[in-house]
Amino acid sequence: MRGRPCSCAFTGHRRGKLPWGEDESDLRCIALKAKLRAAVESAIHEGMEHFICGMAEGCDLYFAETVLALKSTYPHITLEAAIPCPSQADGWGEAQKSRYRDILARCDYETMVQQSYTPGCMQRRNRYMVDHASLLIAVNDGARGGTRSTIEYAFKRGVNVLDIPLD
């Protein structure tokens, strides 16, 4: 891991909170992925080299796939999977589990935040990411929940936040 000064974490909504749900061919999803790519490239140009992803369904996996795609252009960047607990993907459908495993296999680092599920493990994962970053990229619709809590925690910790509004 590169350490906090050159590290960027990500937070965003799960598939169930996205207006297009599972339909990644929806123009809004395509537009969001383009915004994510632009945000990650901007972060790289500002000196970010290490990217941390919470590996949740939805925006987290879009972010991880974006970083992995950009590694061919920027081979010095690294991707860390910050996993809240080993059972994170257990309740997902087979297609999403396969996607998760594929991304995980391509990560440079894997951090297991705790060894079993507890009600607070997702929040602990989010705090781990913020505590190890100097920039947080956030896809946010402003609603209460884990994404908003992570953004608020980043502000309290003095971590810069790049907000990508969810249209």
Annotate each language-model stretch with its function.
Residues M1-D167:
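Acidic/glycine-enriched connector segments
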